[in-house]
Amino acid sequence: MAEIEKVKCLIIGSGPAGYTAAIYAGRANLCPVLYEGLQPGGQLTTTTDVENFPGYPEGISGPQLMEDLRAQASRFGTDVRFGIATAADLSKAPYKITIDGDKVIETESLIIATGATAKYLGLEDEKKYAGMGVSACATCDGFFYRKKVVAVVGGGDTDRKSVV
């Protein structure tokens, strides 16, 4: 049987929501443990220019923003770890979360901030140009393409409306 580690507050996910939760939990002396998941820093790490985040009037790169949030969470005592939640027993508290298939963490406070994952088409060089013309968020990046010809694939009516 796997050894069980007990923590006050467990956060799964390292995007803006995960790190913001970690900052607040740390300031509340909950000793948060945050597991980064598959993409440390979340989707923003693939964004070149973030101009709609408060506090950065000149904008900031996605990777830099996530480094800043990580540093602030660490400043307030967050234990940031690499690992992937592979199973969860949420039937009753304390909750049991399995990390990487073999480590079990038990917690009374669980924050799941796993965010979203963009669906790409699988075209050659698509990932190479992510954030440099290829975007997965019309709401986030539409501003950069004002008065330009664009192609929108997927998203139902949502992205088409965002483009207009």
Model-derived regions: residue spans:
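Glycine-rich beta-alpha-beta "Rossmann" dinucleotide-binding loop(s) and their flanking helix/strand
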Residues: 110, 114-137
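N-terminal Rossmann-like dinucleotide/flavin-binding domain of flavoprotein oxidoreductases
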Residues: 45-104
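N-terminal glycine-rich anion-binding loops that anchor highly charged ligand groups
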Residues: 34-46
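Extreme N-terminal leader/targeting segments of oxidoreductases
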Residues: 1-9, 67, 75, 83, ...
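Short alpha-helical segment within the catalytic ATP-binding CA
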Residues: 20, 44, 113
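Rossmann-like dinucleotide/flavin-binding elements
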Residues: 2-6, 11-37, 130, 136-164
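Core beta-strand elements of the Rossmann-like FAD/NAD(P) dinucleotide-binding domain
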Residues: 5-7, 99-109
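Redox-cofactor binding/interface segments in oxidoreductases and associated redox assembly factors
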Residues: 12, 106, 112-113, 152
